[in-house]
Amino acid sequence: MISSLERFENIDDSSITAIQEEIDYLMDTLEILRATNEISNDAFLEAGSIQGGLSLILNLLSQGISEAEANSQLLRLKERAKSLNGTYPELDTKIESRR
């Protein structure tokens, strides 16, 4: 999950398309990994919180949130993803292997 978020250094209105593409990629990939039993249901649900966080940032950007606030939200999401990586160390590799 952290690799997905590391694609975004600083986000602004021009990031909207890339964020949407990443949300779609995560949604599809996580579903495949869960359906093929490559990740546990718990990992799937927790990873969904990162995808949901990206969706929140996307919605806030479309509502005109400041770049500073968007990047603050992104930083918090990256911290959550690092924690998730500690719990499920194989998750990031499995997600990235599907690109």
Predicted regions and their residues:
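Generic L/I/V-rich hydrophobic alpha-helical segments across diverse proteins
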Residues: 16, 23, 30, 47, ...
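Intrinsic-disorder-associated interaction segments
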Residues: 8-19, 43, 50, 63, ...
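Amphipathic alpha-helical binding modules
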Residues: 64-99
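Intrinsically disordered, low-complexity regions
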Residues: 2-8, 13, 54, 74, ...
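General structural signal for alpha-helix termini and helix-helix connectors
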Residues: 32-39, 56-63, 67
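N-terminal acidic leader/helix
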Residues: 2-44, 86
